[in-house]
């Protein structure tokens, strides 16, 4: 029987006519771009020497634009994605891709999303158990209107910022203007005092000639005009 069942499985050809290919490809491309941008920001923030603020701001603006694109794409294909049911084919490698299969077949929200929903309900102060369905629909409609308004305002501000000249050339000019200027040896920060020299000065009122602390104190005195602070031998 097992051989017959295996032969039947081999003869069955999957029907991909109902798969929403364009919708899935569009969402996949938008998510891939957003993931790449988020990974780049994470790498920039993980460096020992932080990236210049204007470069980081430019990257964040790109990421926000891609996030808006993902949201718009999901809204455009909302009906198609909501009506799509995911199920594995007989040849799906369940052993090597168990986590992916579990994620696709999950019926409940992940714990993080459940926590977000709980926090949102508590922050809204709305008790859905004590309200009628039409009242809940009005609240959801009002929330959608507010979200749409906020998205439009953000899009206008983003376009305004782009039109004001935050281009690559402007950022390069700004970067050159913010580069550190070379200073003379006298203007550079002096080396810190040595603990031993500080203790000697506090106890005896003098420091050893030629020490780094002596040089630092002498330089500071010359700059301030007060040369009587250090006691002579």
UniProtKB/Swiss-Prot annotation:
One of its GO terms (molecular function) is RNA polymerase II cis-regulatory region sequence-specific DNA binding. Its main location: nucleus. Residues 204-233 are annotated as: Disordered. Gene3D superfamilies: 1.20.58.1710, 6.10.250.2610. Residues 210-223 have a biased composition (Polar residues). It is found in: Nucleus. GO terms for cellular component: core mediator complex; mediator complex. Residues 224-233 have a biased composition (Basic and acidic residues). GO terms for biological process: negative regulation of transcription by RNA polymerase II; positive regulation of transcription elongation by RNA polymerase II; positive regulation of transcription initiation by RNA polymerase II; RNA polymerase II preinitiation complex assembly. It comes from the Eukaryota. The keyword Oxidoreductase does not apply. Keywords: Activator, Nucleus, Transcription, Transcription regulation. Component of the Mediator complex, a coactivator involved in the regulated transcription of nearly all RNA polymerase II-dependent genes. Mediator functions as a bridge to convey information from gene-specific regulatory proteins to the basal RNA polymerase II transcription machinery. Mediator is recruited to promoters by direct interactions with regulatory proteins and serves as a scaffold for the assembly of a functional preinitiation complex with RNA polymerase II and the general transcription factors. Component of the Mediator complex. Belongs to the Mediator complex subunit 8 family. This is Mediator of RNA polymerase II transcription subunit 8. It comes from Candida glabrata (strain ATCC 2001 / BCRC 20586 / JCM 3761 / NBRC 0622 / NRRL Y-65 / CBS 138) (Yeast).
């Amino acid at each position: 029987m097992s051989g017959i069942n295996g032969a039947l499985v081999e003869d069955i050809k999957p029907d991909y006519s109902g798969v929403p290919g364009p919708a899935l490809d569009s969402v996949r491309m938008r998510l891939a771009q957003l993931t790449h941008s988020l990974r780049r920001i994470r790498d920039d923030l993980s460096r020992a020497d932080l990236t210049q603020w204007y470069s980081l701001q430019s990257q964040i603006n790109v990421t926000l634009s891609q996030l808006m694109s993902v949201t718009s794409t999901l809204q455009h294909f909302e009906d198609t994605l909501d009506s799509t049911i995911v199920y594995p084919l007989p040849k799906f490698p369940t052993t090597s891709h168990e986590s992916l299969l579990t994620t696709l077949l999950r019926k409940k929200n992940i714990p993080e999303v459940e926590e977000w929903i709980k926090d949102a309900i508590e922050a809204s102060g709305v008790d859905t158990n004590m309200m009628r369905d039409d009242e809940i629909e009005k609240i959801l409609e009002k929330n959608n209107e507010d979200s749409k308004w906020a998205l439009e305002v953000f899009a206008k501000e983003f376009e305004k910022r782009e039109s004001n000249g935050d281009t690559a050339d402007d950022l390069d000019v700004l970067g050159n203007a913010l580069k550190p200027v070379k200073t003379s040896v006298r203007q550079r920060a002096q080396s810190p005092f040595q603990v031993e020299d500080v203790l000697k000065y506090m106890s005896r009122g003098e420091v050893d000639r030629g020490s780094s602390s002596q040089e630092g104190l002498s330089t500071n005195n010359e700059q301030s005009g007060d040369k009587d602070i250090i006691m002579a031998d």
